[in-house]
Each structure stands twice: as C-alpha cells, then as structure tokens.
Amino acid sequence: QILFVETIAVFFAGFLSVRLLGFALEAAKVSPDVHETVVLVAQWLVALTILWPVARGMPVREWRRYVGLWAPRGLAREIGAGLCGYAAWMLVYFVIAMLVVMVYYVVRQNQPPQSSRITEVLGSNNPLVLVLVFTLATMWAPLVEETIFRGTLYRYWRVRVGLGAAAVGSAALFAMAHGYAPVQLVLVGMLGLGFALIREWRGSIVPTMVAHGVHNFVVTTAMLVILGLSG
C-alpha cells in the first residue's frame, strides 16, 4: 500500500515542479510561446509518475488491477458505462452549476467570474501550443488524473474512510490541483465527485477515463471555437 502513497506524492512533486518551471521561465522573461511549449511538454512527462509502483517492482498486472485500469466485464461495456454515467451525472452537474453561478453573481454583485489560465492558453496563435493543450485535456488528463485521483487516491481512501469521505476528499484534491478560481473549483470538484461514483459503481477507471475524456473534448473544442470566432 505504501507504493500508492508514494505514487501520489511523486505525482504532486512532478506537478509542482512543472509549476516552478513555469515561474522560472517567467522570471527569465522568455517569449510566451516558448514558455507555454516548455511547460506543456514538461506536463506530459508527469504522466510517467503513474508508473511509480511498477518502477518500484510491482507487477504490471497487479498494478492495473489495483488502480482499476482493466475491464473485466469487457471494454465495450465499460465504455458504454462511462458514457451513461457521464450523461446521468451531467443532469446533477448542470443544476448545481447554475446554482453556484447564481450565488456567485449575488455575492460578487454581478461581477463575471475570473478567466482561467486555460482560457488564456487556448487563445494562443501558436498551433503547437494548441495541439499540446488539446492533447493534454483529451488524452493526458483522462489517463493520468483518473489513474491518480480515482485509481489510486480514491481507492486508497475508500477502504479506510468509506465511500462518502473518499469520494469528496479525492474530488476536493482533484479540484484544487487545477488551481482555478473559486467558482471553477466547485464545478471541477463536482466532476471529480461524479467520476468517483462511477469508479465505485464499475470497479474500473476505464469508464471514468471515457467520461473525463468526453467532457474535456466537448469543453475544449467549444472553447477553441468560441475563442476562434471572437478572435
């Protein structure tokens, strides 16, 4: 079990290192395109951290079974479960999203929510940066974040603190790792909670990877289209 605690620590260390690299590049006053490209490529390398248990000697089969990177009922069925679970959770998500946004506007007296870093990056005119962002959102995030937050963290906490605390706790860390503004943190946390429930339902992260990938694909594509039209 200690290998999975180490995995979480190694992942966050890698994630923090990428952030520090970004600050260092800003201090060095490199061009925005170079800054974004280097940081995004470095974030791709963080994907290697999910293999920490394997690097420490755990058999691949055992690692995959622990984190849920398998489909004992069949891959097609798990993909279908991911799509159905995502669609069902979106009904809850949209209701809560509307409530959160309404409360925000009341509290902040109609001030619009702060734009996120991802919005700024997606506004880049550099094709390489856009490709890196799109692949990070639609490939890296479903694989790495689901393996870490639902496959490792949720799984580790589930047997120790129960379903509710494990789902909420892993969703909270998932949201905070994104570093968004408060409103966006709540919405990302709600996604994380839904993914945790899908993980509990299926005993696999394949459906959560599908749900995560579909969500990020739709959102990122929509943002690219909107920013392209507004540009």
Model-predicted regions and their roles:
Residues L25-P32, G68-A71, Y104-N110, R155-G164:
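Membrane interface segments of multi-pass transport proteins and intramembrane proteases
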Residues W89-M98, Q109-G231:
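Transmembrane helix-loop-helix hairpins at the membrane interface
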Residues L16, L83, A87, M98-R108:
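Hydrophobic alpha-helical membrane segments
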Residues V60-W63, V103-R117:
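Peri-membrane helix termini and adjoining interfacial loops of integral membrane proteins
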